[in-house]
């Protein structure tokens, strides 16, 4: 049956109320092509219906027999209905004043940053800045982040964010293992490190043979450790002078990692000045809500000698084709997409959007404002200490920045009861102690309430705050020897945007430089840059989600946990597995968790020797990097000429490693953009040799509602909620990478013993700092699924496949489509082969990518999985009009290439070799090129009315790596 145009329905009268109700309205907003457009594209492909196309694309042997079993969410909700339902869940949460601390603090998000960064699609819909010429705004914001972290830590170089403080500490551990003394496998963790950090470190250390020892910091130098982790200030609030200890550790051949509070570093001597080799931490308290644990931007800073070992993205300064400063991602050869199992880390997505928020918090407040905030926090803590001592309590720590640990003896339970009555959470530090951490939001009234609670428990009257303040010596809590004397944030960017007017204009100037989904489609293969709907994003800013501490009592988080349970069941339905954990806070971490689960399963069966992981040659680089981190040996399986797993080679490798085979990691549909016909056979071969099947869920957008990895042989998968389920990419994070497993693996799902979170009774431990990972962005995916319902989620998948095949069909006469399935069809993406073009014209895939910028497009994925190709994924959200605009651009570029091939254009002086063209170049007095200015800037007529100008010319990557500079650029350099 052909799709019926909705206008025809409107001509039928009378229409019932049921016919006029708009439960499907959101799906019509989310799916780009309307019925008429879809039919036109189907006609181009030679299919009468979408169903007929899908039958031809997906092997019948793996098709889902039943409708997506979403239970109460099977029927779509309107945007208003979904928001109301989620509001009802949010209202079940109780927003208490939280003084739990432990790395999470209340903070004020400046409204100008909330509205113009977090709520601005120009920022949150952007992709990781692999194409630097159209990413200069967010690259500058991330460079500000790096400068901020380097300044505050006192170390030479910082990366552009990591996932959370605990995983950053684990990354520091493995960094120091690579550079440390080879005779030691011991990593020593001081006993006042945050408990969630220690737990993640233990999880990360076990599979790679690192022995974690924990004890008093004073014993660290004698531990013969390659690295030592110190907390500054400590978990109990104590501020210790570690200078002599750091010297002793270095003398013993070890290195020092310091987990440092970013706000405290505005008033405390930075770790880089007293011996730290690496500093890690969290920037959450720089304007990012707690959000029940995330997302937040962690940081890592290192000494210059370790810069090539540092994980994560690194923004560096280079020059463009005109010799002007330009920013780019530096030292990319460290990363998993290039070095695979030899990479420094498996991290792809980090926390770019949150890093940008934190950096803008520093820009807005400046060094003076930040120090004022820190001094006020410290003063409130000092007044609290004076008051409770006046009431007869003793503090465990005499020195502190913002945290007190208090001996409360038999009054402890009563204190917590009094606090609960005032809707206050104190930290439960054992049966006889209470912890209190104050923050930027703590007011005089809050301090009075805290003193009243302690006074009630003591049977006394709370002391007067003004009297305490008048009698308190300046800064009594910080050791004078550790007072910060060095300057920080001296660069002009941190000292000029302090009025809201200036800040607003600065943010606008940066966002105008970038190309995000709010301007045009981003056809990146394997990235699924679909719509991030406004209604999905709205709940992220609700205080009922944002102001919840991850370690708050369970009775205060009922709504959160109910929403999370519902989302887990939605994902179970989509994947065909039995259970899901949402703890992994990136796809890379979901991969890693899945492999640890496989290892735990084998171990439980007395087969811990199984450590070989088969990985197809076409796999994304995170797969081998994750396998290496999980302690597995990577064995590569060949692919055939069509890009499919070579079954003969798979059988040979499985036979050769049968005794030790742990798993195979496959991506489905494959990284070549095809539904492999023999995926069931692949799974059966591995199972026959005792292995487990890991199905990478990066391409889940081609499967939802049509097939499911848990039904065709998969044992475990990770998903990317920031791809398939609409969490935005944020310019390089946040992401969520849930791990989904079959029933036999459910008991091994991640848990967190330090907080009592037990998802699996034999769980692998914690893989992120918070029990539910990046919990505050989970409502985005909940909203998407609730508003789509089963039928429309399936329709979205079908439309994504339709759009990809339409592009492949239209572009095939101009660019060979490298891989396809039966009938010449592809899955949800297609690979265009540009290698013959390079041979005939000298034009490279890089030239085409840069030229697309002149046409107003972000390039498709370059040279993955095959060098010299472009991988195009349009998603279901792009209209036929936008697809046609992209197709027209690609055809026009092919004509420009043909001019070079035929000698009508010079092989060097042509629009592709000099792309992208900036406004400054096009309007300069001199025009040295054989082609016209109009051809350079306006190659198609549509650009005259709506033109995006790349802010810089082509970035010189080699120059940037040869002359590595990863700090803010002086204003004079832009002159």
Swiss-Prot record:
Keywords: Oxidoreductase, Pyridoxal phosphate
GO CC aspect terms: cytosol; glycine cleavage complex
EC assignment: 1.4.4.2
InterPro entries: GcvP, GDC-P_C, GDC-P_N, GDC_P, PyrdxlP-dep_Trfase, PyrdxlP-dep_Trfase_major, PyrdxlP-dep_Trfase_small
Quaternary structure (record): The glycine cleavage system is composed of four proteins: P, T, L and H.
Keyword Oxidoreductase part of the UniProt annotation: yes
Protein name: Glycine dehydrogenase (decarboxylating)
Organism: Burkholderia pseudomallei (strain 668)
Catalysis: reaction(s): N(6)-[(R)-lipoyl]-L-lysyl-[glycine-cleavage complex H protein] + glycine + H(+) = N(6)-[(R)-S(8)-aminomethyldihydrolipoyl]-L-lysyl-[glycine-cleavage complex H protein] + CO2
Family in the record: Belongs to the GcvP family.
Role summary: The glycine cleavage system catalyzes the degradation of glycine. The P protein binds the alpha-amino group of glycine through its pyridoxal phosphate cofactor; CO(2) is released and the remaining methylamine moiety is then transferred to the lipoamide cofactor of the H protein.
GO MF entries: glycine binding; glycine dehydrogenase (decarboxylating) activity; pyridoxal phosphate binding
Record-level GO BP terms: glycine decarboxylation via glycine cleavage system
Matching PANTHER family: GLYCINE DEHYDROGENASE (DECARBOXYLATING), MITOCHONDRIAL, GLYCINE DEHYDROGENASE, DECARBOXYLATING
CDD domains per record: GDC-P
Cofactor section: pyridoxal 5'-phosphate
Pfam families cross-referenced by the UniProt entry: GcvP2_C (PF21478), GDC-P (PF02347)
